């Protein structure tokens, strides 16, 4: 055995041996229990970053541990390979998107292999491959056949930089595109949608079945689905047969309606606007069209409106109230209209005051004054007043009575509404999955026949600087015969939102090489659901909600039997690094140009502010994984990533701690090297000495603690701390010829194997084993080894610790008091003194109370 640990010498060797042995191949169906371990697959940017490393190492430890436990494990990897960066690279660098993407995949695949990940590369998928997106298109057609994919003209979120449409979820709280950062505009386009709203209630209710998900993620999805229970009401337009429909959760306040507001985009606006108000209304609509959805609805933004001149009748009171349009009402949400109750809604109250609209109080607190002048909205429940026949009812009773009254009179009904909107999937870009639809002048919209799939992206494409999709300019590619009538027709030129690709990839992994189907029933039902999914919290709504939706739809198409795709979800924290910024200029300064002991701006000499932030190029604080692997090896990088912080917490990069993990692996190496060099013959098993019992107890304590850490919340940091304790316990004993010592050494290496797989296999081999350590079962806990012959008892005098004694385990309370009283430590303080009281805490302490 080499006396010095060299990661460079052993890691490539073992990676090659694992490949030759096929250790990472997914076993076929058997009597063994299955475990599906999955990391969210990456976008192939071409370079691994530390966030990737953390994600994939966490999943790999789980996969390796489960294999050692006797599970057959599916641990695949692939590439979320469609998307704008490849298209922008074609524009900026003149490289075709496919070439750029596949080059990046090749680079990142090798980087991942260097980490020693136990991935079954035979199941690798790339969403940009026609072999994959053929089935993405096929699944889209399943949605279409089920009535879940449809077209409509809609005011959509338009990214003016990337020249494409965004889903609501892809616009941040400031109204900016999630990718380009541009202020999003509204634009009317005919688009494809998926009817996720058909599954809103099931998506909401099934969150209750996801016991293995973080509560935070479930709450985010619950809020996004946004279920509201209320009523649908119709206000007749004066002088017209039209009605303004509204949804309200405060039916008890309907007698306080003093105006109705339409969204500027509402189709009734043109009909209800009077000639006198047309100019003002048109100007207001033009002004609002320049505002983002977020600006229009944010609490801290002004709520602006203008009167249309039209009126509606409150069906409960017969009173006519004005119709206004306002920026804070969105046509895409609810009915696109709201009733204004300024006495009992803070936003309505502010809007009414600014527009000189009346305020009518109809709810008062119990014991309140119905004639009092309101200075601000009363928004709580209470007693109904000024509400005709419903006066005196409490809000809850009033809601029910009014709902019944409205239903009986034909102008309202109880209703459930969701904040969730249908999923807009059309994108005006090239590098995405083509939507498999055809437009025929005679037959209308026609699906591409299954036999003609995939609709393949053309390769001879010219790109202009972010000027929309080149597919729309390619007449030859668009030209196609109609599958129904055979006449000349044209292809759809939009491609799908890339979140479609990632909404089913976990299903494809179960049968990745099937050329006849996206996946067959036997393998998909064998492996699904994913037992452990690992990825970032940033995907809580988008990817995770869409994946749940897709799974439910394919279940209803009898393609899979599970209701939910992911049993357990671990959302790992970010990897942060020390970041420097000049507080005067607000500019980031590269960390490698700063002395951490005296941080100064290298250009100006000004003092810098140092703090931890997520690693990123723009902050000049990234750490290249390749440099860490070159210097220390993959095992050290893995150990640091796992030890530095619990997986769900943010991790702060620290070079000194990386060095610390390298030293720890060296200590284990030296321990095994010393044992091997001693060439000690192991003596026969006999009665164990105290030292042997103590060592065996340390071994099985480590097994117990590490197993609990890997079964529960994946506290890898405390598991590695147990490895350190065990290493120290072995180092401190001298019985190297004992079978217990050999058991301890081998157990230490077995426990290390999921965390640092290369060094573990090397040390296992050096101990004379011919098989890979990754084929050996996880150590079995022997509960009897945890029992102790003696325990330590603290002796206290007047509550102050004076020393400890050893007593037999299981000693009675009375015998413990006698033994403690007779001990030299106690006698030193109590001899010849009155003992007022003796407090005995079994297995812990004895406290003597004597006169001061």
Swiss-Prot record:
Its EC number is 6.1.1.4. A motif ('HIGH' region) lies at residues 42-52. The keyword Lipid biosynthesis does not apply. This is Leucine--tRNA ligase. It comes from the Bacteria. One of its GO terms (biological process) is leucyl-tRNA aminoacylation. A motif ('KMSKS' region) lies at residues 614-618. It holds the Pfam family Anticodon_1. It comes from Picosynechococcus sp. (strain ATCC 27264 / PCC 7002 / PR-6) (Agmenellum quadruplicatum). Its main location: cytoplasm. Residues 586-606 are annotated as: Disordered. ATP binds at residue 617. InterPro entries: aa-tRNA-synth_I_CS (IPR001412), aa-tRNA-synth_Ia (IPR002300), Leu-tRNA-ligase (IPR002302), Leu_tRNA-synth_edit (IPR025709), M/V/L/I-tRNA-synth_anticd-bd (IPR013155), Methionyl/Leucyl_tRNA_Synth (IPR015413), Rossmann-like_a/b/a_fold (IPR014729), tRNAsynth_Ia_anticodon-bd (IPR009080). NCBIfam families: leuS_bact (TIGR00396). GO terms for cellular component: cytosol. It catalyses: tRNA(Leu) + L-leucine + ATP = L-leucyl-tRNA(Leu) + AMP + diphosphate. The keyword Phosphoprotein does not apply. Keywords: Aminoacyl-tRNA synthetase, ATP-binding, Cytoplasm, Ligase, Nucleotide-binding, Protein biosynthesis. It is an enzyme of class 6 (ligase). It is found in: Cytoplasm. Belongs to the class-I aminoacyl-tRNA synthetase family. GO terms for molecular function: aminoacyl-tRNA deacylase activity; ATP binding; leucine-tRNA ligase activity.
